[in-house]
Amino acid sequence: MKKILVLGGTGFVGRHLCEKLAEGAYRTTVLTRRRASASHLQMLPMVDVIEGSPYDTAALTPLLAEHDAVVSLVAILHGTEAAFDKTHVQLLLGLVKACDAAGQRRIVHVSALGADLSAPSMYQRSKARGEAVLFNSGLDVSVLRPSVIFGAEDKFLNTFASLQKIFPIIPLAGSTARFQPVWVEDVAAALVKCIADNSTVGKTFEACGPEIFTLKQLVQLAGQYSGNSKPVIGLPDALARIQATLMELAPGEPIMSRDNLDAMKADNIASGQLPGLQALGITPSALSAVVPFYLGAQGLRSGLMAKRKTAGRF
């Protein structure tokens, strides 16, 4: 039985990966800084959760020695240049050092579509630097570059559906940016395939769905499927920049940042120059085949509540 160490396993993709690994009879260890945040994983068969920091090279080394491969999922979407560098570059430098010390050669890493040293955003450039660290390490590395990821617990379509419950119109920055959304289950399946198939070593795969949408179309679909459709108004660049700045100043994680806007200067779609999910034997699922089943439940609840109110039962 193969043993897999997962860094960043408590997040959106990590949860689905752990489920897939359990289905495939892998023994999985998830390293997290807060064990309490992984309660949803502790119920899965053959998944162990241990507390620790992925930045602690000394503690990471013996863990790596006990496993057959490590999956690197740790990432942030918002932050400063220094924060992106720490998470997407320095962490991987430490991981490579720990792998060398442990005799661990196999790394499967999730990067991002659009990762490039000359990309318009700090996020994408830091992702490219992280890839370079891994491919220059001499280790057996496979890299997955997903477009925006959707699924039942996503913070993307669910967020836009929720906003349309509250606001009468949705002013939208970056409305014409194009994406090729990919289902989280397909991403998890691709990672398992990379773990299992050594022919993926040294390769980068673009994980994209079968359809291309503008951001405006995606927001409109979120409203439509959730039963809360509102007018979506694209903002000109100057107003979009102001909106993103204000969102950064709000408490909590911003819905959109100025760096996100910079990333959207380039389309987030498959380049056609790298292998995709099909090369891993995966037929990507269409957004329309998945999203109505989780956002549609919101629309059903909204409709029932409206009927109860009309009938005087609310």
Describe the role of every protein-language-model region.
Residues 2-26:
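N-terminal Rossmann NAD(P)H-binding glycine-rich loop of SDR-like oxidoreductase domains
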Residues 113-125, 149-154:
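Conserved catalytic-site region of short-chain dehydrogenase/reductase
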Residues 194-257, 271-314:
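Mid/C-terminal beta-alpha module of Rossmann-like enzyme folds, strongest
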Residues 111, 131-155, 159-162:
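Conserved beta-loop-beta element that borders a ligand/cofactor-binding pocket
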Residues 7, 31, 73-74, 107-113, ...:
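SDR active-site strand-loop-helix element
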Residues 14-15, 89, 128:
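Residues forming the Rossmann-fold NAD(P)(H) cofactor-binding site
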Residues 36-102, 113-117:
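NAD(P)H-binding glycine-rich loop region in Rossmannoid oxidoreductase-like domains
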Residues 155-156, 174-196, 202-206, 217:
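Substrate-positioning beta->alpha
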